Swiss-Prot record:
Keywords: ATP-binding, Nucleotide-binding, Repeat. This is Probable ATP-binding cassette sub-family F member 3 homolog. It comes from Encephalitozoon cuniculi (strain GB-M1) (Microsporidian parasite). PANTHER family: ATP-BINDING CASSETTE SUB-FAMILY F MEMBER 1, ATP-BINDING TRANSPORT PROTEIN-RELATED. The lineage of its organism: Eukaryota, Fungi, Fungi incertae sedis, Microsporidia, Unikaryonidae. Pfam families: ABC_tran, ABC_tran_Xtn. Residues 89-285, 351-554 form the ABC transporter domain. Gene3D superfamilies: P-loop containing nucleotide triphosphate hydrolases. It comes from the Eukaryota. InterPro entries: AAA+_ATPase, ABC_tran_Xtn, ABC_transporter-like_ATP-bd, ABCF_EF3_subfamily, P-loop_NTPase.
Length: 554
């Protein structure tokens, strides 16, 4: 019986050899998205010309899993597994991941050890969130018995916060900053940031075997961040996607680096990963240069004695040795990201607050504010959510007027104001360049976009990633040539390389910067003055950001 099956398999393969697809379009015409090869359970890729006659082609067969479609990954209405009973042990996976015809990961072995805390890092758009979704969907042979939870931040439910989070989640909600009054609010009435906190509370309360956290630090203040760092240490296995270096350093013990279709595993936290990767890259570069030198010497010998009869045999030997050597490929260098803010020169005080009070209705938000913003100020404002930090920035930017007191602005003042919600509400179907040309000439628009690494002539705003939208926001304000940058949570959605580029650009900027941020690494690298917003006032903190965090006593 087995010989018959074997014969049928080989007959099938011989037929397949005679029918290579020359293009994806040809495969589509015959209604084929992939061809399953019986004896390997593999999938023949049809994105490029392919034939089973080619040894290289046969190696391209994708073995463990069929392609994963993004729409299928996001079809679940809940982030929690309710039909699983628990799982003891480690996961040993081989990961192949495709989305909409694009290869994300190729045959990458990955072991997830029970009880470990992992950081998943990589550039924007490389597939980190897609990988988390695939794990949530139990691709790669993940057992049904394993309870997996992944927060779906876009899921809005019609119930109170405490009902949504669970009966035992009271202390968790408190740790994340919820008051008793907020805990009885409907989820639909919360801002995106507070909804995310409620999802975090539910996830932690569920105590899954594997918790998947995608950018959990966005919109959390430093108090909540400190609390979450401590709580993660008590959980079971966790995989975290975050661009907050300090948070990853304090929560993770292994780093998964998604890069070049691979998952490289590093022991230690993020800081340790950076050192190890730097050493690995330097070692690869030295090995490449050494091999290049060997080949150059051999080629030089061949060229010199090619027509020397006495050395003919030695030359032929060198030629054969050189031909047998594998193709030498230079180690890939990470592209350098550079941001540039232009400015309008200014000197002295740009803005002065004199006994400023601001109220919403009958409730005073800020009061008694008296301070100056000078042309070289580098100010970061920190404090718990809901204390009035964003309101203060809007007063600076002229988006709000003082209820009492006065705000004196220099005649030369030009403000560039960045807030994430402005970017999120742009028209998704509008072309990026057309949008920029509403305010600038085409040359100015292109220059502003290029200053932040954007070349998106034919792209609509809706197709941009979160990080690209933030860059678009920077490009918009850069076209104004401001001398005061007012930035509300500018690092949300940026990858680490872009955060570094932003910090460096602010360091070179010839003007003042006032920013609200909770990213401790970004604050340390970009700002000299720390102000605390609490109890309706804003006061100077004389110390660094780590001293401020330590003083919270969380």
């Amino acid at each position: 019986m087995s010989s018959k099956i074997s014969s049928l398999k080989h007959k099938y393969l011989r037929k397949l050899e005679r029918f290579p697809f020359e293009s994806k379009e040809e495969a589509t015409r015959v209604g084929v998205g992939g061809c399953t090869v019986g004896y390997t359970r593999g999938l023949v890729p049809l994105e490029t010309p392919f034939s089973m006659r080619s040894v290289r082609g046969r190696k391209e067969i994708v073995v463990p899993d069929a392609p994963i479609q993004e729409e299928y990954l996001s079809s679940s209405s809940s982030g929690e597994d309710t039909d699983s009973e628990g799982f003891e042990g480690d996961l040993h996976l081989v990961i192949d991941l495709f989305v909409k015809g694009k290869e994300i990961i190729r045959e990458a072995p990955l072991t997830i050890v029970r009880g470990r805390k992992y950081g998943l890092v990589g550039r924007n758009g490389i597939g980190k969130t897609t990988l988390l979704k695939a794990i949530r969907k139990r691709r790669f042979g993940i057992p049904r018995g394993m309870r997996i939870y992944m927060i779906k931040q876009d899921l809005i439910v019609d119930e109170t916060v405490e009902d949504f989070a669970g009966a035992e989640a009271g202390r968790i909600l408190n740790g994340l900053g919820f008051t008793k009054d907020m805990a009885v609010k409907n989820m639909r009435d919360l801002s995106g940031g507070w909804r995310m906190r409620a999802h975090l509370a539910k996830a932690i309360n569920a105590d899954p075997d594997l918790l998947l956290l995608d950018e959990p630090t966005n919109y959390l203040d430093i108090n909540a961040l400190s609390w979450l760092e401590g709580k993660i240490k008590e959980l079971k296995t966790v995989i975290i996607v975050s661009h907050d270096r300090n948070f990853l350093n304090n929560t993770t013990e292994m780093i998964l680096h998604l890069n070049d279709l691979k998952i490289d595993v590093y022991r230690g936290n993020y800081e340790s990963f950076v050192k190890q990767r730097k050493e690995k890259t330097a070692s690869a570069r030295r090995e490449y240069e050494s091999q290049l030198l060997v080949r150059e010497h051999m080629q030089s010998f061949i060229d010199r004695f090619r027509y020397n009869a006495k050395r003919a045999s030695l030359v032929q030997s060198k030629i054969k040795m050189l031909a047998k050597m594998p193709t030498l490929v230079a180690p890939k260098q990470d592209p350098v990201i550079k941001f540039t803010f232009s400015s309008t020169p200014a000197q002295g005080a740009l803005i002065e607050f004199v006994n400023v009070v601001f109220s919403y209705g009958c409730g005073k938000v800020l009061g008694g504010l008296s301070m100056k913003i000078n042309s070289d100020s580098r100010i970061v404002v920190v404090g718990a959510n809901g204390q009035g930090k964003s309101t203060f920035l809007k007063l600076l930017a002229g988006k709000l007027e003082a209820t009492e007191g006065s705000i004196i602005r220099a005649p030369s003042l030009r403000v560039g104001y960045f807030a994430q919600h402005h970017i999120d509400h742009l028209r998704v179907n509008e072309n990026v360049l057309d949008f920029m040309m509403k305010s600038y000439t085409q040359e100015e628009a292109r220059r502003a976009l290029a200053s932040f690494g954007l070349s998106v002539d034919n792209q609509c705003i809706g197709t941009l990633s979160g990080g690209q939208k933030s860059r678009l926001g920077f490009a918009i304000i850069n076209g104004l040539s401001p001398n005061l940058l007012v930035l509300d949570e500018p690092t949300n959605h940026l990858d680490m390389e872009s955060i570094d580029a932003l910090a460096e650009a602010l360091g070179r900027f010839n003007g003042a910067v006032v920013c609200v941020s909770h990213d401790l690494s970004f604050i340390s690298s970009a700002f000299r003055e720390i102000y605390i917003c609490e109890d309706g006032s804003i006061r100077r903190f004389y110390g660094d950001i780590l001293e401020y965090k330590k003083g919270l006593g969380v």
